[in-house]
Amino acid sequence: TLKLENESIEIKGKKELTYLWVPSAKAVVGGIPVSSGIHLWMADTPKTKDRMEVIQSLESIKALQPKIIVPAHMVEGAPQGLDAVNFSINYLNSYEKATKATKNATELSKLMQKQYPTLQSVDSLELGAKVVKGEMQWP
């Protein structure tokens, strides 16, 4: 917990899935797992268990019942608040199904683009698909 001008700011989550919780404002700030308006970065979550940990982190954010949520990754005009958290959960669930339904990164990328045609960061989608499908190593 940090203190800033008599306000507590809690660092929540684990490892790379941390976010800041400001209890007095009921606000989640900079939650790495929360994205909106873009394809989620999947290169850091190559295994199903990794993606399930992200969903668990998102569910822990929802359990706080925040009034304000500022996504860590988003485009201008994209939904914020619980809409962004729910979007991220739905995207991860769709991605998991698409991973099982496709043979390679190209198929995975195309299927996700078909399901989410308006999202930005297609290059991130394509790179992550290569890592998830074992066609590329990511540090």
Go through each PLM region and give its residues.
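Acidic, metal/ion-coordinating pockets
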Residues: 1-5, 21
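Soluble metallo-hydrolase cores and metallopeptidase-like ectodomains found primarily
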Residues: 4-13
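Accessory terminal helices/loops
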Residues: 8, 63-68, 76-139
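Metallo-beta-lactamase
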Residues: 12-90, 94
